Amino acid sequence: AEGCDRRFSASDELTRHIRIHTGHKPFQCAICMRNFSRSDHLTTHIRTHTGEKPFACDYCGR
């Protein structure tokens, strides 16, 4: 994009970066139809629907 001089060593990093400029969000939540530019953001979002909390404190278990 004009004015962007970012460079990447891996093509997937460039692909992910291009989405910032295009606004392309190819990952969609099947529950609420919200779209995300990254699959890891969708995975985290889905937990808002399921209530899943996969990370617990080793000290107190919460």
Swiss-Prot record:
Enzyme class at the top of the EC tree: transferase
Give me the segments passing through the membrane.
Answer: none
Compartments, record wording: Nucleus
Cellular component aspect of the GO annotation: cytoplasm; nucleus
Keyword NADP found: no
Pfam families found in the cross-reference section: zf-C2H2
Gene3D superfamilies in UniProt: Classic Zinc Finger (3.30.160.60)
Coiled coil (residue ranges): none
What pathway is it annotated to? Protein modification; protein sumoylation
* Molecular-function GO terms, alphabetical: chromatin binding; DNA-binding transcription factor activity; DNA-binding transcription factor activity, RNA polymerase II-specific; RNA polymerase II cis-regulatory region sequence-specific DNA binding; sequence-specific DNA binding; transcription cis-regulatory region binding; transferase activity; zinc ion binding
Q: Where are the zinc fingers (C2H2-type)?
A: 1-21, 27-49, 55-62
Post-translational modification note? Ubiquitinated by WWP2 leading to proteasomal degradation. Acetylated. May be deacetylated by HDAC6, HDAC10 or SIRT1.
Q: What is its EC number?
A: 2.3.2.-
Keyword Transferase: yes or no? yes
- What's in the keyword line of the UniProt record? Acetylation, Activator, DNA-binding, Metal-binding, Nucleus, Repeat, Transcription, Transcription regulation, Transferase, Ubl conjugation, Ubl conjugation pathway, Zinc, Zinc-finger
Q: Name one GO biological process term.
A: facial nerve structural organization
User: In terms of one coarse class, where is the protein primarily found?
Assistant: nucleus
Q: Which PANTHER family match?
A: E3 SUMO-PROTEIN LIGASE EGR2, KRUEPPEL-LIKE TRANSCRIPTION FACTOR
Its biological purpose is as follows:
Sequence-specific DNA-binding transcription factor. Plays a role in hindbrain segmentation by regulating the expression of a subset of homeobox containing genes and in Schwann cell myelination by regulating the expression of genes involved in the formation and maintenance of myelin. Binds to two EGR2-consensus sites EGR2A (5'-CTGTAGGAG-3') and EGR2B (5'-ATGTAGGTG-3') in the HOXB3 enhancer and promotes HOXB3 transcriptional activation. Binds to specific DNA sites located in the promoter region of HOXA4, HOXB2 and ERBB2.
Q: What is said about its interaction partners and assembly?
A: Interacts with HCFC1. Interacts with WWP2. Interacts with UBC9. Interacts with CITED1. Interacts (via phosphorylated form) with SFN.
Q: Which family does it belong to?
A: Belongs to the EGR C2H2-type zinc-finger protein family.
Q: What is this protein called?
A: E3 SUMO-protein ligase EGR2
Source species of the chain: Cerdocyon thous (Crab-eating fox)
Gene field: EGR2
